[in-house]
Amino acid sequence: MSIILDATAANATPTAGQDKDLIKDSSVETFVQDVIEPSMEVPVVVDFWAPWCGPCKSLTPTIEKVTREAGGRVKLVKVNIDENQELAMQLRIQSVPTVYAFKGGRPVDGFQGAQPESEVRAFYERLAGGPIESPIAAILDQAAGALADDDHETAHGLYVGVLER
C-alpha cells in the first residue's frame, strides 16, 4: 500500500484570511461584535494578555496553535489589557494571562495563568464537544501504517515532514 502525502498540504497553515476569521484582536469598541455575537454560533475563547507578561508569551502561541487545529469549531479573540483597561475592569480581570470562554453571549469557563498544551487542548475539547487532534498525530499514524506495509520510503518521507514542522 502506498500513501501519498502532498507536502504542501501537510505543512499548510491557514492563510491570512482564514486565520483572521479564527484569531483576531479586539478592543472595548469591538468586543460585542468580536466575542458576544459570534459566541451565539461557536464558542469564543478570549485571551486577556499584556506585552510585559512573561507567562502570556508562552500561553498565547499555544492557544493560537490549538485554535487553528480546532478548524473553526472554536474562535480566539485576544485583548491587550494595557490598551483596553476599561474592558479589563468591566470583566474583573485581576491578573494575566486570563482566559475566558464565551458561549451564547456569556462566559462559561476559563482559567488564569499559563497552562501546558495538554490542558489548553482539554479546555478546547470541552468547548468544542469532542477531540481536537494534532495534525502531526494523523501523519504519525500514516507513517506507522506505511512501515507496517513495508513502505519504508513513504514512512521516511512522512517522518521527515513531521520533523520539519
Regions found by a protein language model. Name each.
Residues R92:
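Flexible N-lobe loop architecture of eukaryotic-like protein kinase catalytic domains
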Residues M1-V45, W49-G71, Q85-E86, V96-T98, ...:
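Proteins that catalyze or organize thiol-disulfide redox chemistry
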